[in-house]
Amino acid sequence: IIDLKLPQDVINIIDRNNWKDEYVGNQPAFCIYLGNDNGPFEDLAIVEKLIKDGTMILPVFFNDFSKEIPEELKKQNGIKYDDNQQSRIANIVLQAFELLRSTRKVFISYKRSESTSVAIQMYEALESHHFDVFLDTHSIEKGELFQEELWHRMTDCDVILLLNTPGFLESHWCKEELAEAGSKQIGIVQLVWPNHKINAISHLSFPLNLESTDFVNTIYDDKDKSKLKNNKVEEIVQFVESVRARNLASRQDNLITEFMSIAKQCGRDITVQPERYLTEVISGKKIIYVPTIGIPQSFNCQAADIRYEYDKNPQNTRIRLIYDDLRIRDKWLKHLDWLNNNLKKDIFTLKKQEFKKWLETTK
């Protein structure tokens, strides 16, 4: 919650002690059920009520799912707990409340002649943890415009995993990717190779220094044979998970700041709400601005608080998804424009390059 810069009371924590007083069935809810291998299973009456209400439940077990989780939750997809999973569990909760986007996108930036084998290893590891991973050799279909698609995928990622090898900045394309990350203000997790200095390369950078002992047989300088040890790979995956919220919040901050600055220049009176959307009232009609990171999707305006505001007075409420269109592929921008012209409800996207024009001319 702190990383997302949301008010502390945005989520109300309920347990068996305050359940009867605090739980309301028609409010959004998410349940974490902690497993117990000693038995008997606890709080089954609460579980049955939550299932009846259609509440999402995440079973968390410690050793054996079949022994620790009650029959009522055996159909649920659980997660095994350890200290490395804390960020993952927290993010699952935030995603369920639509406070953090559910697509977990990572872009791997590396120099092919120095770290191909590690790049592929991290691609496979992140995919196995259900990340949507971009790796240039694996993620672009034949016949696509390579560089255009690469920038497009970077724009839509949550975080960049940069394999900072000694020759990384000697590559023209690696430097281009780094510059692009800076212009888009995307946070970077740096894996810094042994005997290599950290470069101050981003406004939002999270370095992780690697030692030769982190590599299998201490081989770290062979592009085809170097492999990280399994425990280090797991540490990196969890590190990437832990910085997602901070990175997305930072990008959202920048988008809000830029939009508010232009709005002030145009004499508009716009308010930033604690839930991090913006509102404005003009001639008795409310406009809700939803800051969107990456490529706008329909679910960006389906969050519970946005739906609540819209449903109070749909006839006099407009929704605008504001987003940075830099490097989004033209075919996607045309699709979004087509949706703007064909949607029946007053819900449209508003691209960054048109902020000023729209704020100056729309009343």
Task: Enumerate the predicted regions with their spans.
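Conserved TIR/SEFIR loop-to-helix hotspot centered on a Trp-containing motif
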Residues: 26, 36-55, 166-186, 199-200, ...
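Short glycine-centered, acidic/aromatic-flanked micro-motifs in structured strand/loop junctions
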Residues: 35, 108-112, 135-137, 164-165
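Conserved BB-loop
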Residues: 2-24, 122-152, 166-172, 292-298
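C-terminal interaction surface of TIR/SEFIR-family domains
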Residues: 1-5, 38-39, 51-128, 194-363
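Generic beta-sheet signal
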Residues: 34, 60-63, 163, 191
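An anion/phosphate-binding loop that grips the pyrophosphate of nucleotide cofactors and donors
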Residues: 28, 157
